[in-house]
Amino acid sequence: AGAEAGIDIDTTTTPYLNTIAPDMQGLYPGDLEMEKRLHTINRWNAMMMVTRANKYVDGIGGHISTYASASHLWEVGLNHFYRGKDGDGWGDHVYWQGHASPGIYARAWLEGRLSDENIHNFRQEIGGAGLSSYPHPRLMPDFWEYPSVSMGLGAMTAIHQARFNRYLHHRGLADTTLSRVWYTMGDGESDEPESLSELALAAREGLDNIVMTM
C-alpha cells in the first residue's frame, strides 16, 4: 500500500558488487578451457541420463535441470575447493543437493567410477546395478557419504555436522580445524522449515566452518 501511495520504502535487495577488487584477484588456478569442456560434457551426460531413463520407463522423473542450474558451483568446488580424506586433516564434508545427483553420477562415470550399466539404470535399482534417485548411503555405501533428501534435511544436517566438528575440536577428540562443511541449497528447498530452522543455531554457535550457497 505504501509503494502504491508513492512512499519511498527501503528494500533489502542490493546491487551485485564483487567483494574482491579486480586488482586483488589472482589468476584462475586451473586450466579454464579444459574445465569448461569437461563441465559441458558432464552437463550434457546428466541430462541424457535422465532423458534416457524416462524414455524406457515413462514418468520415472529425475530433476533434469537442477544440476545444470548450479553445476558451475559443484565443478569448481570439486576441482579446487573440496578436500578429500587422504589429505591433511579429516577432509571436508560435502552435502550434495539431492535433486542434482544425475550430475554427480555423470562426473563419476567420466572418471571411470561408474559403469555404463550403472548409468543406464538410473533410478532402477532392483536389478542390482542401478543408481539411487538421491544421495543414499544405505543403498550406495561406496558412493554416497551423507543423505540430503527429503528436501530440507540436507541443510539441517550440514549445520549440525559443522557444529559436531567444532565440538570434536573443542573437546580435543579430533583436529577438525581444516575441515569444512559444504552445502548448496535449492531455491525451493529454502522454503522448507527444516532448512531455515537451524540457521539460528549456526549463527548462535558462530559456525564459520560451513559454507552454504543457494
Language-model features, listed with the residues they occupy:
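Terminal amphipathic helices with adjacent charged low-complexity linkers/tails
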Residues: 1-22, 89, 97
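Short internal beta-strands
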Residues: 94-97, 210-214
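RNase H-like, metal-dependent ribonuclease domains
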Residues: 20-30
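Core catalytic machinery and nucleic-acid-binding channels of phosphodiester-processing enzymes
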Residues: 62-66
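Cofactor-binding active-site loop characterized by glycine-rich and histidine/acidic residues
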Residues: 30, 34-42, 46-56, 67-205
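Short glycine-centered, acidic/aromatic-flanked micro-motifs in structured strand/loop junctions
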Residues: 60, 185-186, 214
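Short, intrinsically disordered, charge-balanced linker/junction segments flanking boundaries
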Residues: 1, 206, 212-214
